[in-house]
């Protein structure tokens, strides 16, 4: 499988990808400890994407943080994605951008980012999945499959919606929402291509980030 259809940037995929983690940043990034942890986590060779998602940060700080993260992602051959903001993604020359339903229009984002990766959140809606297919996105994010501490869950997704989406498209599916050690395998077995993970890695009270990701076999 390819990460792109009809002109969007591609990534090779296995039936169950060894690099199945779509890693999302913590809500705040301060100090050098995060960057040390990030190097170790990406070196695990389990991560395909890293998304920079900082909701309450200035553009200036986003660019400063993004430049540092981009170097680490490049070192470990991880695709660097910016959340919500195609303009920042372009300024950083990131690999792509992730868009929510209330963010910039996909076609407008494509004009800015050209052939870069553009993924979109479709919550639990097959109607939104079909629109994403028509818009020729790079990947489709579905969820939340489980409750999450990262953000309030407005849309609850089921394994059924994942199965239905897989039947109508070959565009890779990213499962999101509360994914951790106790529930991740069910999503992979139901053919989610990537798992978006954040709190389990960065806010785990039992394991440090490297140990947490190594637990995901």
Task: Describe each model-derived feature in a short phrase.
Residues 49-112:
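N-terminal active-site wall of soluble small-molecule enzyme domains
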Residues 38-53, 135:
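Catalytic domains of carbohydrate-active enzymes, especially glycoside hydrolases
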Residues 23, 99-109, 141-153, 178-216:
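Glycine-rich phosphate-binding active-site loops on the catalytic face of alpha/beta enzymes
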């Amino acid at each position: 499988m390819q990460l792109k259809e009809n002109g969007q940037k591609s990534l090779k995929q296995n039936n169950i990808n060894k690099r199945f983690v779509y890693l999302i940043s913590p809500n705040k990034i301060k100090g050098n400890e995060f960057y040390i942890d990030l190097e170790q986590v990406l070196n695990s060779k389990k991560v395909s994407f890293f998304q920079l998602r900082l909701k309450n940060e200035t553009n200036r700080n986003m660019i400063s943080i993004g430049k540092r993260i981009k170097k680490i992602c490049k070192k470990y051959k991880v695709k660097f994605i910016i959340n919500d903001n195609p303009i920042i993604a372009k300024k950083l020359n990131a690999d792509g951008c992730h868009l929510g339903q209330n963010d910039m229009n996909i076609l407008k984002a494509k004009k800015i980012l050209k052939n870069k990766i553009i993924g979109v959140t479709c919550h639990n809606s097959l109607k939104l999945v079909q629109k994403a297919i028509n818009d020729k996105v790079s990947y489709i994010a579905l969820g939340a499959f489980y409750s999450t501490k990262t953000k309030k869950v407005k849309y609850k997704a089921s394994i059924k919606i994942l199965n239905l989406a897989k039947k109508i498209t070959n565009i890779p599916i990213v499962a999101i929402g509360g994914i951790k050690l106790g529930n991740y395998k069910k999503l992979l077995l139901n053919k989610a291509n990537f798992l978006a993970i954040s709190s389990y890695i960065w806010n785990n009270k039992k394991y440090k980030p490297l140990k947490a990701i190594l637990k995901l076999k």
